[in-house]
Amino acid sequence: MTQVTVKELAQEVEAPVERLLQQMREAGLPHTDAGQVVTDNEKQTLLTHLKSSHKSKAEEPRKITLQRKTTSTLRVAGSKSISVEVRKKKVFVQRSPEEIQAEQKREQEERRAAENAAREKADADARQRNEEQARRQAAQAPAAAPVAKAEPAPAAAAPAAPAVPDAPVSEDAAARAAERKKDEARRNESRTRDDDRRGGGVAGERRGEAPRVSIKVKVKEKEKAPTPRAAPRTTDEESDGFRRGRGGKGKPKKRNQHGFQNPTGPVIRDVTIGETITVSDLAQQMSVKGAEVVKFMFKLGTPVTINQVLDQETAQLVAEELGHKVTLVSDTALEDSLAESLKFEGESESRAPVVTVMGHVDHGKTSLLDYIRRAKVAAGEAGGITQHIGAYHVETDRGMVTFLDTPGHAAFTQMRARGAKATDIVILVVAADDGVMPQTREAVQHAKAAGVPLVVAVNKIDKPGADLDRIRNELAVEGVTSEDWGGDTPFVKVSAKMGTGVDELLEAVLLQAEILELKATPTAPGRGVVVESRLDKGRGPVATILVQDGTLRQGDMVLVGSNYGRVRAMLDENGKPVKEAGPSIPVEILGLDGTPDAGDEMSVVADEKKAREVALFRQGKYREVKLARAHAGKLENIFETMGQEEKKTLNIVLKTDVRGSLEALQGSLSSLGNDEVQVRVIGGGVGGITESDANLALASNAVLFGFNVRADAGARKIVEQEGLDMRYYNVIYDIIEDVKKALTGMLGSDVRENILGVAEVRDVFRSPKFGAIAGCMVIEGTVYRNRPIRVLREDVVIFEGELESLRRFKDDASEVRNGMECGIGVKSYNDVKVGDKIEVFEKVQVARTL
């Protein structure tokens, strides 16, 4: 907290110190000296005092006059119109406080007089009621006595005869008295209503006592009266809502009462807390303000903000301390309920094996599959290399086998990893003339990580340089031992070109499948994995699904990762429509709401509501993870990036034909760069380059890359107008090489020094024009004129300058070669000594590389 003295405060507000001390004394502050310290609270007190002392209220107008004028046109016969102007004037007068007090005093006196009158009236009614009660009892007592004596002496009833005429007289008197009370009650009711309008309060309640008494009297007399009448409505009955319709007829209306009542005790809420929850969400569930939760957390010693995320334990502690009931839920509860609903019931049957062909690039994986499928696939791939996962099922003489062909290029690591996870057996293709290569080792690691058995196919065995023993040795180093050497991995010599050994390879694969005893339940709902996905312009999102269990049928509602949809159509690998697909069958499905990621699990769900709920939940989780990764402004990263220069960034908008290629390119391009340059893929997707992609590239100064896709007319128009850089590729090598070249250009160039020659000083001469001249012998390289030099004494640089004069004998020379003598004049330096070395060098710019 910053503290200043009275003198400093006076200088700050530009006021004399004595005047400031006087104002502080008036404000009640204890300061008497200019050197005393003034705290922030005392400043606030002084400011409040000054505001109140200088505040002047403006005279408010006592009378406000409002005038309103409206003009209208009135048409009369003969096509004439008359203008009518209506003026209205309202005057609002503000009364003085004396008038208001006088009126309040007058109202109090009237209220007090009304209370006294009501009290006197109530006393009079009570006395009258007592007198009437006494008269009735006196009139009824003589008549009751002869009745009690009627049994022993019937003649004794004669004295009671004179009392019979008195009964009607008492009833008439009671009726007249009741009529008078009814009129008085009506008058009291009207007075009470008028008093209540002016301000009821306690007096109004007291005024209501007299009508209540009249109600009780009337109820008692109603039992005796021969012709009962309706009791007069009182103020209490009116206030309780017993108002009738016109003329007092109709049913009584229900009282309009306010619905909210303050709770008599604390309200206990059911609070549902996930693994994380924000302070605002927690406060909303407890029906309290967020500031209350923040205040409570401060009391616990944990300063938080209203948007801060709390863990489950902390949120549970806060909710329980505030007296609420807590229910802990897991973030995977929705996923768990989905897993429970997917029941696989039925008899298990044998299924075909799923075989993945893996290996180094150009080792003949696809060519081997071509021979098995009797089709030419490799020729259709750009550059002759596989850039997608291909899924095929083949009917052989020994049964059906499903093959997955994976890319061998280094960029497709994720594709190969997914292929190993979705497979039962891995065929590792190794070229006999090339041996074990980096992607071969990677394929072995993927197979081991997935726990999948290997079958090694030594391809190109018909080539002259084929060496099977070399392959066995190199794979043994990687932990893959041949059966011939006592291991458990079969090695098969094949030639994809000639077809040699293909039958033996299939036999080895089916033998491994029999050992694994692969089972599936065809009657269960379908479950599988996404092999590949793409966005077709005419058909929408298309996903290649490998069914692993159950049966997938057309019309099923499927959940695929964070996407869902109903299967509108299914196609096999040849493009023919099918109605259903059983275990180990790859199919393409149409009808999803987006392109799922390759490797996402597919499952058939019962209804669309469940699928949508889980898909939205997964999308939310993915969005949270993505935002958490992109949030680089965290406190722990601030100090790491402090002092570092900002990297140069190459922004790229990347569109590919399939999801797997997009993932592979994003991973490969993001790994390029160093501490000075980096690649950032700001936009990526599956499908053609659209107008929105071109606008994104324009806004972010990015380069547009299309991999096996093209731009539409709108995108091409924007590219031409704005001069954007858009490039098409169909081979992954080319796009990576071009990005490397672009990053190299962004690095700039380095300045490198090349030593041209070294001369040793043998003697020093004096020249009137140049000063000290060094007589030198060139001992290394060539000495050039007008080049930068360094003077070294005992191999330590003592001066750096420029060679001003170079002579051989008395003639100027442009250069002096090794082993020759010369005279050297150093510009602005005269301290040359015998034994020094003069080093001549040049600075050249060299392009930097990654």
UniProtKB/Swiss-Prot annotation:
Residues 495-497 are annotated as: G5. Residues 136-172 have a biased composition (Low complexity). This is Translation initiation factor IF-2. One of its GO terms (cellular component) is cytosol. Residues 244-257 have a biased composition (Basic residues). Residues 459-462 are annotated as: G4. One of its GO terms (molecular function) is translation initiation factor activity. Residues 405-408 are annotated as: G3. Residues 384-388 are annotated as: G2. PANTHER family: TR-TYPE G DOMAIN-CONTAINING PROTEIN, TRANSLATION INITIATION FACTOR IF-2-RELATED. Keywords: Cytoplasm, GTP-binding, Initiation factor, Nucleotide-binding, Protein biosynthesis. Residues 96-135, 173-210, 234-243 have a biased composition (Basic and acidic residues). Residues 50-72, 92-267 are annotated as: Disordered. It comes from the Bacteria. Belongs to the TRAFAC class translation factor GTPase superfamily. Classic translation factor GTPase family. IF-2 subfamily. Its main location: cytoplasm. One of the essential components for the initiation of protein synthesis. Protects formylmethionyl-tRNA from spontaneous hydrolysis and promotes its binding to the 30S ribosomal subunits. Also involved in the hydrolysis of GTP during the formation of the 70S ribosomal complex. Residues 359-366 are annotated as: G1. GTP binds at residues 359-366, 405-409, 459-462. PROSITE patterns: G_TR_2, IF2. It is found in: Cytoplasm. The gene is infB. Residues 350-517 form the tr-type G domain.
